[in-house]
Amino acid sequence: MSEYQSIGVIGAGAWGTALAQTAAKAGRDVTLWSFENDVAEAVNTKHENTIYLPDVALSTAIVATTSISDLDACDAILAVAPAQHLRRVLEGFLPYARPGLPIVLCAKGIEQSSLSMMTQVLKETIPAALPAVLSGPSFAIDTAQGLPTAVTLACADETVGNALIEALGTSRFRPYLATDLIGAEIGGAVKNVLAIGCGISEGKGLGKSAHAALISRGFAEMTRLALALGAQRETLAGLCGLGDLVLTCSSPQSRNMSCGLALGRGVSLDDIMSGRRAVTEGVASAPAVVELARRHGVEMPICEAVNEILAGRASVDDAIETLLARPFTLETA
């Protein structure tokens, strides 16, 4: 039996449900907390998340609840609430979190109000928890259906990290251990903003060459910010950096890229967001990424252009022209 036999999942969106399914397939007992009654009821009665992950038959080992106190006896927690709501959700879980409880942060974003990474939010809300980060190239539907997926699980305590990998890993879901939490977090947050940019390029019909340039130059921006914050370069070259960036920037299955596609085709951001129930993390993270970069003296022109478009301060065409008018420079700059 695993050291972490009972897994609590906080957040029953598509990704939280997919991770619950993966943990159940790994033989764990899973309690899935949902903010929404209709989601919890569907998971328990139909064994399907009809709202966020329809047409996927869920394991009967997953028990959904709307009472976060039901996670008090879990051996480890996967925190999959959206980045901008994580603080409030963790504050609600604080009374039930015992010291040393591993909490794996699965949201990819930066808190807009404080510019805090998710590990910092956890440190401020549940300081006695043991933090880990799960990030990498993984669409919820692929993971839930058991298609081969590899991710990074970052944990400073390698013993705990390896135990979490044993608890969650299967032949189809393969976590790789890292100890660089900052790198894993920055990769996940910045790639969402860059994916919006790639979607805009695709929506405007700028071609595959421009798409490749955005991915590679975007990766340089991601790496510069991560290094400025103390991350290791090797982390960004792995699954949680380059791997996640390539996936998210290459498929309209990504909510961030599909948002950019619509923007590039002339749809307003308000119209895009009003038609979505699921969160598009890059929209909320863009201003935080840009401000964090400014405070650390890091140039991120692609992310800045995306943020200007999202904020309504620049049209898509003007933002593109501004990028193309930048001075020529060394590729490593």
UniProtKB/Swiss-Prot annotation:
Location(s) in or outside the cell: Cytoplasm
Positions that bind NADPH: W15, K108, A140, R255, V279, E281
Binding residues for sn-glycerol 3-phosphate: K108, G136, S138, K191, D244, S254, R255, N256
Lipid metabolism found in the keyword field: yes
Pathway terms, separated by semicolons: Membrane lipid metabolism; glycerophospholipid metabolism
Molecular functions (GO terms): glycerol-3-phosphate dehydrogenase [NAD(P)+] activity; NAD binding
Top EC class, one word: oxidoreductase
Catalytic residue positions: K191
Keyword terms: Cytoplasm, Lipid biosynthesis, Lipid metabolism, NAD, NADP, Nucleotide-binding, Oxidoreductase, Phospholipid biosynthesis, Phospholipid metabolism
Chief localisation class: cytoplasm
Nucleotide-binding keyword on record: yes
Pfam family, one: NAD_Gly3P_dh_C
Record EC number: 1.1.1.94
Family under the similarity heading: Belongs to the NAD-dependent glycerol-3-phosphate dehydrogenase family.
Annotated function: Catalyzes the reduction of the glycolytic intermediate dihydroxyacetone phosphate (DHAP) to sn-glycerol 3-phosphate (G3P), the key precursor for phospholipid synthesis.
PANTHER family for this protein: GLYCEROL-3-PHOSPHATE DEHYDROGENASE (PTHR11728), GLYCEROL-3-PHOSPHATE DEHYDROGENASE [NAD(+)] 2, CHLOROPLASTIC (PTHR11728:SF1)
Protein name as annotated: Glycerol-3-phosphate dehydrogenase [NAD(P)+]
Organism whose genome encodes this protein: Maricaulis maris (strain MCS10) (Caulobacter maris)
Gene name per UniProt: gpsA
